[in-house]
Amino acid sequence: MKKLEALLENSFNIRFDDKRLLETAFTHTSYANEHRLLNISHNERLEFLGDAVLQLIISEYLFAKYPKQTEGDMSKLRSTIVREESLAGFSRYCSFDAYIKLGRGEEKSGGRHRDTILGDLFEAFLGALLLDKGIEEVRRFLNQVMIPQVEQGTFEKVKDYKTCLQELLQAKGDVVIDYQVISETGPAHAKQFEVAVLVGEDHLSKGTGRSKKLAEQDAAKNALAQLSEV
């Protein structure tokens, strides 16, 4: 953890008082489960807290930044900013992926590079930072890491895959597109949804995500990739 502490201090001017909070934020459930006798805490509860403070800070920012945007437009942009893929990218940008503790099986299966794990890690770090330093320190960190990307319009350029799929298919004729939840797993604060996209009665593709909306976007993205190969 010394290297992680040095990274945070040198890159972001962050120094944790409670080192246990920081260690917990970087401990995946798979690692804790493999070391049950040591009674190690994992980062799911911190992830829950981090998700909440992230939503609040980004919502406040968008409300102030875009006074003429509708609630729907702001919600869509916020969803893009805080989606799993985006948060995983921020974890990589901060080099957090190098420091997460994973179980052996998760490590071997490529968990260190998985968006789901890295997105959760970013939220867990925010939760730990909130408890250790307060919301203003979380806001300062996000102003360093996330907000510059928002200011550059990065997230406004992200594709709405459902709309792209609908436009592509309807250009070929009048079709009915439907999204159905196949499975719902995980605890209440860390759900994982699997969704299928159907065209009429034909199963086109599947996708996963931490919400139904994200899973639908992933399914539409996979469907577009599949159709491009035809």
Curated annotation (Swiss-Prot):
Domain RNase III: 5-134
Gene3D superfamilies for the chain: 3.30.160.20, Ribonuclease III domain (1.10.1520.10)
Domain of life: Bacteria
Chain residues that bind Mg(2+): 47, 120, 123
Catalytic activity: Endonucleolytic cleavage to 5'-phosphomonoester
GO cellular component, one term: cytoplasm
Keyword check for rRNA-binding: yes
CDD domains: DSRM_RNAse_III_family (cd10845), RIBOc (cd00593)
Enzyme Commission code(s) on record: 3.1.26.3
Ranges of residues in domain DRBM: 160-229
Keyword Cytoplasm: yes
Broad class of the protein's primary localization: cytoplasm
Single GO MF descriptor: ribonuclease III activity
Swiss-Prot/TrEMBL keywords: Cytoplasm, Endonuclease, Hydrolase, Magnesium, Metal-binding, mRNA processing, Nuclease, RNA-binding, rRNA processing, rRNA-binding, tRNA processing
Localization per Swiss-Prot or TrEMBL: Cytoplasm
InterPro entries referenced in this protein's UniProt entry, alphabetically: dsRBD_dom, RNase_III, RNase_III_dom, RNase_III_sf
Active site: 51, 123
Pfam short name (any one): Ribonucleas_3_3
Cofactor list: Mg(2+)
UniProt GO BP: mRNA processing; regulation of gene expression; rRNA processing; tRNA processing
Family classification: Belongs to the ribonuclease III family.
NCBIfam families referenced in this protein's UniProt entry, alphabetically: RNaseIII
Functional summary from the UniProt entry: Digests double-stranded RNA. Involved in the processing of primary rRNA transcript to yield the immediate precursors to the large and small rRNAs (23S and 16S). Processes some mRNAs, and tRNAs when they are encoded in the rRNA operon. Processes pre-crRNA and tracrRNA of type II CRISPR loci if present in the organism.
Subunit structure: Homodimer.
The protein, known as: Ribonuclease 3
